[in-house]
């Protein structure tokens, strides 16, 4: 009864399809649905599914090429692979042997004799060095007709079987891009009909790499060459190429830095110092009239945060504590004036996050300015004479100062007294600088020496002598290996901190050097001088050629402009060199 009902359903469906004018609708219904498969049929279906795909479909369209094009296309592929030094070209190179054999056999079957001889004589020499290939190549020379091919067991095996070539997925894509770039119909036909490309996945696990060591060749793939495992995995080879490229960049000539110059015009009061914040958003300048001027270098104006306590006023019980709104604080301005010192301001330093500013003055004090409210929040006192310079440690945990009292002092932001006193110089401490690891502090003095101190112990660990005048500027290389010093003797000296000896002496300036800065990669150093020039030096250079002006051979660039005084140089993280200076008074805007 169940069978009759199934037949009734099929008849009803067939009638419906006929009314809808579907062609050959009875065939599939009469065949019925097969619910079982033999193991042989299942294996055949799985093989078809695994073998069919874009990896093995090099050319889906029928390809026909003139016999004369065989030589042109094969020669073009050989030149493409041999001229390239990439890893992909080396992996595709074994494909040339089966391509040559099959192209030659196709020419024997369909091409004129002159074309066959020309093709063989031009390319057969590149395969004679391989012993396993030499025998087949020599047999091709005596093959002139189809009967010669059929009578030769090895050549007939080439036509009866597909030659297997294993390629990595990246190398396979490399080959496909080449085949699509020009007319390669003869090559595409051979690849589609006679060659099986076994494409390996690009990424494999360690277990898969271990498991793939066994042979998976079948009886029909007896022509497949033995697979030689690569001694270097693909990712290791790529890493070596990357490291070699990085080494060539490091050892190569440096790229000249871009210089951005900030000029000060109409400085009625004498300008002593200028510095730019690490994020290039703020510019601070200290003047002889005791004030500090702060500029915004971006479109955003300087706006004070609301503060709820006014310490300059005494509130009475009957007063209403209403905030007095300042229109300037609400809208913001491009410049703020910070007042608090009672003497010339000699140095300023921004915190790493630009949230605060330190300044030192002739009034023997150091002041901390909150850049949120633009007010002086802390006063540090301890020096007995004017303070010439301040510097902040890399993580803004400590700061140091140098003074006319011949000492340098270590401070913390939450203490108004010094934590350490570094005594040992015989004259003023003109400049101070923290090492990148914050464990050491360098000081330069009018006594013509540079000292390196242990920041925690407070003792001197290095003494560098050799300058012929006061030392006015110091700078550590970011890698922590070198210390640069310069001053009134017009010489820039590089000291090796590990050995405590002089590494290089750079000459070229004609006046006192006032500022130094290392590039982020420690390969370049910039120096600013009172001779109104900025010079950039390559400290990695070993060139002994001296320029005509007598400068050191390490000089790679000189910047001179309409300046009367260069105040400072600073390298940014993007290899941008920021320079601040005063323009000549006769220079117009």
From Swiss-Prot:
SMART domains: WD40 (SM00320)
Family label: Belongs to the WD repeat TAF5 family.
Annotated GO biological process: positive regulation of DNA-templated transcription; regulation of DNA repair; regulation of DNA-templated transcription; regulation of RNA splicing; regulation of somatic stem cell population maintenance; regulation of transcription by RNA polymerase II
Organism: Mus musculus
The organism's taxonomic lineage, starting at the top: Eukaryota, Metazoa, Chordata, Craniata, Vertebrata
Family matches, as Pfam families: TFIID_NTD2 (PF04494), WD40 (PF00400)
An MF annotation (GO) of this entry: transcription coactivator activity
Database matches in InterPro entries: G-protein_beta_WD-40_rep (IPR020472), TFIID_NTD2 (IPR007582), TFIID_NTD2_sf (IPR037264), WD40/YVTN_repeat-like_dom_sf (IPR015943), WD40_repeat_CS (IPR019775), WD40_repeat_dom_sf (IPR036322), WD40_rpt (IPR001680)
CDD domains: TAF5_NTD2, WD40
Subcellular location: Nucleus
GO CC entries: cytoplasmic ribonucleoprotein granule; nuclear speck; nucleus; SAGA complex; transcription factor TFTC complex
Keyword Chloroplast in record: no
The protein's name in its UniProt record: TAF5-like RNA polymerase II p300/CBP-associated factor-associated factor 65 kDa subunit 5L
Subunit structure, as described in the record: The PCAF complex is composed of a number of TBP-associated factors (TAFS), such as TAF5, TAF5L, TAF6, TAF6L, TAF9, TAF10 and TAF12, PCAF, and also PCAF-associated factors (PAFs), such as TADA2L/ADA2, TADA3L/ADA3 and SPT3. Component of the STAGA transcription coactivator-HAT complex, at least composed of SUPT3H, GCN5L2, TAF5L, TAF6L, SUPT7L, TADA3L, TAD1L, TAF10, TAF12, TRRAP and TAF9.
């Amino acid at each position: 009864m169940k069978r009759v009902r199934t037949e009734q359903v099929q008849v009803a469906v067939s009638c419906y399809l006929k009314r809808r004018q579907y062609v050959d609708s009875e065939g599939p219904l009469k065949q019925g649905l097969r619910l079982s498969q033999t193991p042989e049929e299942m294996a055949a279906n799985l093989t078809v599914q695994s073998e069919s795909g874009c990896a093995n479909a090099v050319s889906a369209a029928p390809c026909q090429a003139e016999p004369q094009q065989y030589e042109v296309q094969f020669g073009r592929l050989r030149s493409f692979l041999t001229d390239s030094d990439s890893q992909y070209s080396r992996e595709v190179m074994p494909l040339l042997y089966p391509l040559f054999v099959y192209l030659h056999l196709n020419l024997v079957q369909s091409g004129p004799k002159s074309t066959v001889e020309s093709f063989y004589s031009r390319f057969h020499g590149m395969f004679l060095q391989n012993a396993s290939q030499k025998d087949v190549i020599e047999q091709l020379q005596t093959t002139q007709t189809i009967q010669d091919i059929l009578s030769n067991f090895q050549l007939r095996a080439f036509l009866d079987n597909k030659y297997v070539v294993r390629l990595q997925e990246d190398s396979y894509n490399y080959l496909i891009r080449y085949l699509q770039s020009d007319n390669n119909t003869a090559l595409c036909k051979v690849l589609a009909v006679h060659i099986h490309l076994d494409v390996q996945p690009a990424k494999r696990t360690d277990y898969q790499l271990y498991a793939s060591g066994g042979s998976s060749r079948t009886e029909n793939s007896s022509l497949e060459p033995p697979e030689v495992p690569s001694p270097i995995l693909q990712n290791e080879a790529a890493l070596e190429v990357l490291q070699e490229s990085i080494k060539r960049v490091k050892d190569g000539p440096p790229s000249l830095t871009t210089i951005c110059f900030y000029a000060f015009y109409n400085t009625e009061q004498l300008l002593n110092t200028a510095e730019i914040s690490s994020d290039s958003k703020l510019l601070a300048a200290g003047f002889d009239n005791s004030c500090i001027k702060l500029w915004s270098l971006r479109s955003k104006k300087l706006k004070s945060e609301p503060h709820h306590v006014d310490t300059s006023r005494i509130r009475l019980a009957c007063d209403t504590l209403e905030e007095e709104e300042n229109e300037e604080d609400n809208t913001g301005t491009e410049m703020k004036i910070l007042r608090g010192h009672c003497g010339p301001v000699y140095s300023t330093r921004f915190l790493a996050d630009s949230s605060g500013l330190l300044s030192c003055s002739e009034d023997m004090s150091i002041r901390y300015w909150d850049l949120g409210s633009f007010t002086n929040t802390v006063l540090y006192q301890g020096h007995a004479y004017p303070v010439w310079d301040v510097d902040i440690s890399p993580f803004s945990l400590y700061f140091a100062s140098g003074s006319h009292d011949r000492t340098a002092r270590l401070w913390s932001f939450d203490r108004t007294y010094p934590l350490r006193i570094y005594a040992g110089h015989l004259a003023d401490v003109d400049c101070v600088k923290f090492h990148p690891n914050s464990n050491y502090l360098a000081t330069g003095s009018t006594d013509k020496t540079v000292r390196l101190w242990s920041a925690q112990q407070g003792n001197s660990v290095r003494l560098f002598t050799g300058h012929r005048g006061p030392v006015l500027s110091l700078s550590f290389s970011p890698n922590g290996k070198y210390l640069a010093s310069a001053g009134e003797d017009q010489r820039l000296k590089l000291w090796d901190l590990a050995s405590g000896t002089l590494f290089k002496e750079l000459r070229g300036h004609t006046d006192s050097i006032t500022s130094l800065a290392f590039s982020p990669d420690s390969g370049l150093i910039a120096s600013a001088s009172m001779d109104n020039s900025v010079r950039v030096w390559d400290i990695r250079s070993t060139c002994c050629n001296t320029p005509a002006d007598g400068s050191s051979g390490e000089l790679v660039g000189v910047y001179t402009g309409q300046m009367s005084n260069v105040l400072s140089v600073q390298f940014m993280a993007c290899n941008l060199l920021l320079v601040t200076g005063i323009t000549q008074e006769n220079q117009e805007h």
